């Protein structure tokens, strides 16, 4: 799966979480500024995660404010 991500802080955050998922095989979670939409990086793999992020970026490409990883 290839995800086209626009440049900017949001892109860095998304690329970071996707890279984390690929290298550490962990789950991740992010939330939008309005905190009404929460999404997760599936443990199942990077393809699933990329697909999900693609959907969310279409909804609000500049609204991603933070990415957290479970301890």
UniProtKB/Swiss-Prot annotation:
Gene Ontology CC terms, in alphabetical order: chloroplast
Main enzyme class: lyase
Membrane spanning stretches: none
Main localization, broad class: plastid
GO MF, any single term: fructose-bisphosphate aldolase activity
Top-level taxonomic group: Eukaryota
Note: On the 2D-gel the determined pI of this protein is: 5.6, its MW is: 25.2 kDa.
Similarity comment text for this entry: Belongs to the class I fructose-bisphosphate aldolase family.
Name listed for the protein in its UniProt record: Putative fructose-bisphosphate aldolase, chloroplastic
Species, as recorded: Pinus strobus
